[in-house]
Swiss-Prot record:
Binds 1 thiamine pyrophosphate per subunit. This is 2-succinyl-5-enolpyruvyl-6-hydroxy-3-cyclohexene-1-carboxylate synthase. GO terms for biological process: menaquinone biosynthetic process. One of its GO terms (molecular function) is magnesium ion binding. It comes from Klebsiella pneumoniae (strain 342). Belongs to the TPP enzyme family. MenD subfamily. Its EC number is 2.2.1.9. It is an enzyme of class 2 (transferase). InterPro entries: MenaQ_synth_MenD (IPR004433), MenD_middle (IPR032264), THDP-binding (IPR029061), Thiamin_PyroP_enz_TPP-bd_dom (IPR012001), TPP_enzyme_TPP-bd (IPR011766). It comes from the Bacteria. CDD domains: TPP_PYR_MenD, TPP_SHCHC_synthase.
């Protein structure tokens, strides 16, 4: 009997089972203990293979692939800290709903807790963050193949959102020629190998039913809050709110077109808050709101009813409103709750929004990050998509820009970390094959510098704009101690990214005015690969511009 051959037969069943649950993309890091999984994946023609040498970046690449494809994505890594490096991406997926399947190779039980190399306690290492955890036994022909495949089916069939951790111990030898070992064991599955269906099929029904009193509430004064959703859902929400005559407060990730622009500015005006207080019902579609003023208003509003609709389970409401938590996709919920044509009831807010937008446009001439955010619509590629980093840049775009309705926008706004942003953007581009504009800050770029290697395989033009304000300038907007701010919060690095781009063979530009940025982007959209554009801006102008606009709009 060949141990290495049976390891591969066992792994082949696992990988084939994944294909029955819609897995097409599989991300693989180098490793020896993961050899059975890697070779089984390589031999399975149903997969699109992605490789990366850095497991943390690999996890975020998978996250981006899952975001854009809206399908589960598998990841294969070896044992030890390689597995631990998947933690940030797993956490993000759990909060934003992408489906990740983590196949972590492991040492067999007799090599754990005895000083063996690269052997750590992997079962349960991700605590409560995976939706499900499976600790498989060492491959054995004493275990029926139908047990293995049904175990995988049970986990994936019940997966609504988030990650599944499947820990896979393998004993040595890991290498060797294939022989007949395990062929009869695999044949226990009969014609399953020729089918395209899971061995064990489950019906997952979690959606809320139609609200029977909707016909009553849709005649009231309402407000629509739009959080994270798909581009198609964003367009439908905008039309739905317009038909109802309800003001729509659209987050940057809502893709609604933000008909009431600059909400994070005008929500700082007392007149707007007073008018919103007249609302009898607030319907929030999608979670993960970005703007500070939006979150402050959302936390203090007290309508008669507060409904929160999202496909993810859980409360998703840090303000803990009294109302209804409705588990459904936004698209399905809109189908069940049609709008009734009514005249708009809010009259003050549209005018405040118009004036806030005019103020933002009037401030967009200097070359800076706030101005880039306000102008961002003109830089979007046709038939493309936008990936927005975290920290200051996403807040500036949320507050100052108006994005086209239905234009795809992606970001990691679950845990809102600055790790893995370049890798996530790379995954989003690969899954969609669309031209992609990605914008991150300098510290975010440094944090994920390894992932510039992933941009070399861009299948369409990809532009990474690095806004270099020399540190974490978001902390300039917080009441951080003045004396300690620069050393302990901002942490300026005084770097430029020309050498990083050159190291990975990427085109690079460093424009210093709007005309040179226009020229750099025009050239980048004409070339097939990736381009890094570094915008070196004044350290504090971005935060100061936002604060000045907030003060100006609050006085309108």
């Amino acid at each position: 009997m060949s141990v290495s051959a049976f390891n591969r037969r066992w792994a082949a069943v696992i990988l084939e089972a994944l294909t029955r649950h819609g897995v097409q993309h599989i991300c693989i890091a180098p490793g020896s203990r993961s050899t059975p999984l890697t070779l089984a994946a390589a031999e399975n023609r149903a997969f699109i293979h992605h490789t990366h040498f850095d497991e943390r970046g690999l996890g975020h690449l998978a996250l981006g692939l899952a975001k854009a494809s809206r399908q589960p994505v598998a990841v294969i890594v070896t044992s030890g800290t390689a597995t631990a490096n998947l933690y940030p991406a797993l956490i993000e997926a759990g909060l934003t709903g992408e489906k990740l399947i983590l196949l972590t190779a492991d040492r067999p039980p007799e090599l754990i807790d005895c000083g063996a190399n690269q052997a750590i306690r992997q079962p349960g290492m991700f605590a409560s963050h995976p939706s499900q955890t499976i600790s498989l036994p060492r491959p054995s022909q004493d275990i029926p193949a139908r047990w293995l495949v049904s175990t995988i089916d049970q986990a994936l069939g019940a997966l609504h959102a988030g990650g599944v951790h499947i820990n896979c111990p393998f004993a040595e030898p890991l290498y060797g020629d294939m022989d007949e070992t395990g062929v009869e064991w695999q044949q226990q599955l009969g014609n399953w190998w020729q089918s395209d269906k899971p061995w064990l099929r489950q019906a997952l029904q979690l959606e809320s039913e139609k609200q029977r009193d909707w016909f009553f509430w849709r005649q009231k004064r309402g407000v629509v809050v739009a959080g994270r959703m798909s581009a198609a859902e964003g367009k439908k929400v905008a039309e739905w709110a317009q038909t109802l005559g309800w003001p729509l407060i659209g987050d940057v990730l809502s893709q609604t077109g933000q008909p009431l622009q600059c909400a994070d500015l005008w929500l700082g005006n007392g007149k707007a808050v007073s008018e919103l207080a007249q609302a009898q019902i607030v319907v929030q579609l999608g979670s993960s709101l970005t703007g500070k003023r939006i979150l402050q208003w959302q936390a203090t509003c007290e309508p008669d009813e507060y409904w929160l609709v999202d496909n993810l389970p859980g409360r998703l409401d840090p303000a803990q409103h009294r109302g209804r938590r409705l588990l459904a996709s936004v698209e399905r919920w809109l189908e069940l709750h049609p709008a009734e044509k009514r005249q708009p009831w809010a009259t003050v807010i549209p005018e405040l929004s118009r004036q806030a937008w005019q103020a933002a446009v009037a401030s967009n001439e200097p070359f800076g990050e706030a101005q880039l955010a306000q102008r961002i619509r003109r830089y979007l590629p046709e038939q493309g998509q936008l990936f927005v980093g975290n920290s200051l840049v996403v807040r500036l775009i949320d507050a100052l820009a108006q994005l086209p309705a239905g234009y795809p926008v992606y970001s990691n706004r679950g845990a809102s970390g600055i790790d893995g942003l370049i890798a996530t953007a790379a995954g989003v581009q690969r899954a969609s094959a669309r031209p992609t504009l990605a914008i991150v800050g300098d510290l975010s770029a440094l944090y994920d510098l390894n992932s510039l290697a992933l941009l070399r395989q861009a299948s369409a033009p990809l532009v990474l704009i690095v806004v270099n304000n020399n540190g974490g300038q978001i902390f300039s907007m917080l009441p951080t101690p003045q004396d300690e701010r620069r050393q302990f919060y901002l942490m300026p690095q005084d770097v430029d990214f020309s050498h990083a781009a050159a190291m990975f063979g990427l085109a690079y530009h460093r424009p210093d005015d709007w005309q040179s940025l226009d020229e750099a982007l025009a050239g980048a959209w004409r070339r097939a690969g990736a381009t890094v554009i570094e915008l070196a801006v004044n350290e504090t102008d971005g935060t100061q511009t936002l604060q000045q606009l907030l003060a100006q709009v609050s006085r309108l």
